Amino acid sequence: MSQQLQQIIDNAWENRAELSPKAAPAEVREAVAHAIEQLDKGALRVAEKIDGNWTVHQWLKKAVLLSFRLEDNAPMPAGGYSQFYDKVPSKFANYTAEDFAAGGFRVVPPAIARRGSFIAKNVVLMPSYTNIGAYVDEGTMVDTWATVGSCAQIGKNVHLSGGVGIGGVLEPLQANPVIIEDNCFIGARSEVVEGVIVEENSVISMGVYLGQSTKIYDRETGEISYGRIPAGSVVVAGNLPSKDGSHSLYCAVIVKKVDAKTRAKVGLNELLRGD
C-alpha cells in the first residue's frame, strides 16, 4: 500500500502546479489524505532508523506540502476565546474523552498540535506547538513555549525545556528533519535546526544553538565537526578564536561524554557544572 501511495504522491508532486483545492484528481486527494492520516496515527513517519541509520522518506514530506495545495483556508473555532483561519485543523479538534484516554498523553491548555503530527503515550504537552509531520515518542515532555517543527523526530523520554525551538524542514524539500534521539535533555531556549541530529543520551545546556554551520568543538580531542552531536555528549555554548586572534565566533562545546548508566545516576546540574 505504501509503495502505491508513494507513486501517486510522487507523480502528483511533479504536476503540483496544476493542483488546487478546486482542481485535483480524486486519486491524489485520497492518497494525500491517507498519508496525513497515517502520519497522524504514527503508522508512517517522515524519518525512521533502519539498521542503525536514519532514513528520510521524502515522499511523505511531499504529501504534507501537497496537502496545503489541496485545501482552502477555513475558520476553525477555538473554544469561544478566539478563531483560527488555516488549512490544517487541530489534531485534537474532534477528540472525545475516550480518544484522549486511548492516546495516553496529556495536553495542557493552550497547547496546539496540528493534524498529521503523532503524539505517543505518556507524552506531556505543556502550552507548546507541534507542527504537522512531527513525531513525538513515548515519555517525552514538551515544556512551555517549546516548538516542535514540521517533520521533526523526537525520541523516547526526551525533555524539551521551556522555549526550546526544534526546527522544521518542509522546504527546501531535500533538507533532512531535525532528529532528537532517545533520553536527551535539551536546555531552555536552545535551538536545534537544519536537520541536526542529537544522538541518544545527550545533554544540551541552556541557550545552545545548533545548525548545519555551527562548529561543534570537542574539547577532549580538539576536533571540530558539524551537524551531529555524538551519543552521550554534554554540550554547552562557547566561542572559538579566529585564526588571527582578532575576534571569536560562537560554537557549541562538547565538554564531556557520559554513558547511559552515568547519565541516569548523575544529576543534570552536576553534569553541566563539572570541569
UniProtKB/Swiss-Prot annotation:
It is an enzyme of class 2 (transferase). InterPro entries: DapD_Trfase_Hexpep_rpt_fam (IPR005664), Hexapep (IPR001451), Hexapep_transf_CS (IPR018357), THP_succinylTrfase_dom1 (IPR023180), THP_succinylTrfase_N_sf (IPR037133), Trimer_LpxA-like_sf (IPR011004). CDD domains: LbH_THP_succinylT (cd03350). Pathway: Amino-acid biosynthesis; L-lysine biosynthesis via DAP pathway; LL-2,6-diaminopimelate from (S)-tetrahydrodipicolinate (succinylase route): step 1/3. Its main location: cytoplasm. It is found in: Cytoplasm. NCBIfam families: dapD (TIGR00965), PRK11830.1 (NF008808). Belongs to the transferase hexapeptide repeat family. This is 2,3,4,5-tetrahydropyridine-2,6-dicarboxylate N-succinyltransferase. The lineage of its organism: Bacteria, Pseudomonadati, Pseudomonadota, Betaproteobacteria, Burkholderiales. The gene is dapD.
